[in-house]
Amino acid sequence: MSKSLLTWSLLIFLGLTTSTTSCAQKRTKQEQTTTVQKQRTESPEAMLKRFYTEYIRSFDRMYEPAQMDSLILANATPEAKAKLERVRALTDSDPFIRAQDLASGSEGSLQVRALGQDWYQVSFGSGEGYRAIPLHLQKSGDKYLIDFITPEWHHSEYGDKLRSNPFAATKSVDMTSPINFIRSFYECYISHYLAMKPELEVELKALRDRYCTKATIQQYYDSLASVGEVESGFFDTLIDNVDFDPSWCSSLSVRPSSASGVFEVSYSDGEGERHKWLVRAVPQADGSYRLDRQPS
């Protein structure tokens, strides 16, 4: 074999050896990285145990509002946080614990149980202070976040029906008649509450501005400023409430009242209370309507 050929053979051998070694090193490094990532990912049960332990202790430690917000946003989606603030305004209790306050040391009885389909039950306390709260988690990157907590009026229920949107199919407002307009407007409006999107307030305002009279829009802001829930920043005169639950949708009713051209809108909430108010569909020059809520 010539010296030149021997040299080329040696170079090829060294190149293949180097390439194989490099690939092996890359695979080893990738495997190590994956192992570290897996080690960093908390199990759902561990995440809930950690979060609820700190949350319960925060009452004794008297966290500032900013500290509570930071703790919640590190462990729940922004949409869930906004939803839970509305539920808090509705029930006058903290939806994370279904109470206004907790006895010191309650975290000692804390238990977390898997229910299936990303649902878990968090329980703590004893006797009259016992709480068992179902909630749902979603995976976000390498961690889990709370994206729904069962409201207390549903007690121990869990499942996708609690997060459903029965009005999701109503995509537009029907202008074919006054009653169709009112019904479809409310289905669209309520659907935005149920969808729990980040831009909820913007979308609700857009619907009010487009489909309500100026007097109704002003009534919305006046009610917000005069009703007790204003302390927590929530009250919507168009639904006579601070939020809407999927289980209330089947009770939504729109029917003519005794007054000409006036319709009664009503529904029953989780406590069995019947909410009622009167509206008109005001004809516009272009053939459309505007919703006019009648003063109480």
Residue ranges and their predicted role:
Residues 24, 123-125, 136-138, 266-268, ...:
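Residue-level recognition of well-ordered beta-strand positions that form the cores
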Residues 40, 52, 113-119, 128-130, ...:
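Low-complexity, intrinsically disordered terminal/linker segments enriched in charged
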Residues 134-142, 278-287:
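Short beta-strand segments and strand-loop junctions that repeat across beta-rich extracellular domains
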Residues 1-37:
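Bacterial Sec-dependent N-terminal signal peptides
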Residues 75-131, 213, 217-271:
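Surface-exposed, charged secondary-structure patches
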Residues 36-87, 168-227:
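Core segments of small alpha/beta cavity-forming domains
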